[in-house]
């Protein structure tokens, strides 16, 4: 076993879990990596960890669901992602089209290099922000009150190496058809034109740019934005019709105990429908 504290760049990281039952999936992922995990389920544990870290600046506590398993403790050797940056750009609006909506929760999409045998989507919550909000609930006032009023922030981490995610990309490209290559080619050309303009004018200060140059800059920027908006709108439309995208997001929500009410009912009905196929 690697022990409770794992050292990376002279920093000791202690992995912990606050609820071994609710966070069982994350706990098992950490154990599969050979890590031991502390159980910190006391009401004052957040305060204790903050106090301990203030006394030991090279040691920190990280909850097992605060990031994807391969980033909880950074290593010199990192996994490579199958998806290129261009492919991530295509998939981002697809997944955004199926993002859960909640006034009290803010979600953001991130593509991560994870093992292909891990889940296609994992939902994580930043350690610092979560801890501040939890402390706000027990203390109140000052900065704690400020953090307490902020919405909960979660990251929908898409496994860029998972076969299901690759299949979704292939389905999206097939649904978009030849028009996808056409609009992407136009975007690349517009971006290249914008880069050439920036290269020519990079030595000039804003005040030295002529009215014509400022107008051209705005036109080039507007062209790139318009083309990307056109492509993203179509990708969102395709994504909104892809049940598999919603299914793997809901699986991640279910793992975190965040799938309830009508959304849970819809997930069950969709699961039955997919099984019947």
Question: Across the structure, where does each feature detected by a protein language model lie?
Answer:
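Long, intrinsically disordered, charge-dense linkers/tails
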Residues: 1-277
